[in-house]
Amino acid sequence: MTCRNGAGDWKDKTMNLEGKRVLVVGSGKSGAAAAELLRKKGITFVLFDGNKDLDVAALIGKNPVFAGAEILLGELAPEDMARIDLVVLSPGVPTDLPMVNELRNRQIPIWGEIELAYHFAKGRIIAITGTNGKTTTTSLVGEIMANYFDDVKVVGNIGIPYTSVAADTTEDTVTVAEISSFQLETTREFAPEVTAILNITPDHLNRHHTMECYIETKESITKNQTAGDTCVLNYEDEVLRRFGGTLHTKVVFFSSRRRLEKGLYLDGEDIFYADGTTDTKVINVNELNILGKHNYENVMAAVGMSLSFGVPMDKIVEVLKRFQAVEHR
């Protein structure tokens, strides 16, 4: 089976959206944030929602950004498709719907809200994906960054759309993004400086159809990284261990089961960082407020990302000692 992402083969990092007509698919939180960003940038958008019985008045009351916009419900007619230059797809909309396939066949570029935000955002980016542990790790990395940098934004699948903050970023902004497999399906140029894939276990196969496609989607978070960028991977995940050997980026592994010559590892109750020459103790797990092997793995991933991003170890440890568990969503 051929895995299909949402964006097809279309690629143009310098696309000028001025004068373009953008179709926003989905009227929920993600769609509203995308529409708000487009409106801020003076770009015309059309809203589409597959619910033909959607209460438009209630929708506009909840999301005034849709007031005055053209709103299409139920089905998208061919004449409507002909007027569209770009599609922004909400993460909850499957990329293999007949309508999406038809838009793709018409060579209309299809982005997700992450890609749209990246098009306008400035600054440096850290992105985190994985089947489990994303929210805890993203929150921890966000707090570490805020302990060292002045302008930090934590966005993505954690609950804050990237599009809602993209217009407020500067070259000094550090953005920490939790990225789901659904969001990765519709990224094309998104290029984080540091990425992490925490683990990969069977999930969302009703959407991705096969484990191979799910893995491919998760691994695509690295596709635009360069040799100077870094990917942090779980050494104890066999898929990710093999994947690390194929990357042209810097790779930092972490392990909860064995000592690593380079990377982060758990030895008894101590977490160490090994640079190939020296093994440095980072913290004893009893000094943490989050317990369990899965959380120690999240901590090691966060430390690996933060060190790769240039944060001093002492600034990292300060946050590790005070970080509290994230409320389960």
Where are these regions (language model features)?
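Adenine nucleotide phosphate-binding catalytic loops in nucleotide-utilizing enzymes
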Residues: 20, 25-27, 209-212, 249-329
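Residues in the short beta-alpha loop(s) of Rossmann-like NAD(P)-binding domains
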Residues: 28, 51, 158, 236-237, ...
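Residues at the C-termini of beta-strands that transition into short coil/loop
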Residues: 75, 114, 156, 254-257, ...
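Short, glycine- and charge-enriched coil/turn segments that flank and shape catalytic ligand pockets
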Residues: 51-70, 105-107, 148-151, 168-173, ...
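Short linear Ser/Thr-Pro motifs
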Residues: 30, 90, 180-181, 255
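N-terminal leader/targeting and accessory segments in enzymes
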Residues: 3-112, 116, 291, 301, ...
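Phosphate-binding loop of NTP-binding sites
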Residues: 10, 37-40, 78-82, 91-235, ...
